[in-house]
Amino acid sequence: LLVVTGNGKGKSTAAFGMAARALGHGMKVGVVQFIKNRTDTGEEAFLGQHAEWHVTGDGFTWDTQNRAQDIATAERGWAIAARMLADPSYRLVVLDELTYLLSYGYLDSDVVLDALTHRPSMQHVVVTGRAAPAALVELADTVSEIADVKHAFRAGVKAQAGIDL
């Protein structure tokens, strides 16, 4: 279990790099994006041809207008992830931005941690997102924290196709 967390840019990018590496070795890869609701990203356009890819978010924000809807959306995404985590044919599962759903209580942490603990022994999982909960960090084999040293967005540079999405 690898956790890529922190306030810096590149958490999802690091996970998708691992997905590309696994695919290059002929491994079956599954990706569940829990927050993002875009389906026009470069990573999905390319990796989605080779991996099972699910964009399950509805773009909700932390200042939600409908918590019940956000929880239902999270649970739909988790159902897909749980299926992958129970299937030994998946050698790598990327759970992109899962940390937010745990931190905000959109998913039951005990259920998620149990699924991660009892997944097939040869299955690798990458979890991304800011503020990884302590229990997830404790369970992980590897935790990387990406720092926000400087970001072009603060200088007014918008996300660019091929670089940021």
Named regions from a protein language model:
Residues 1-86:
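Conserved P-loop
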Residues 33, 55, 97, 129-130:
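Short secondary-structure boundary segments
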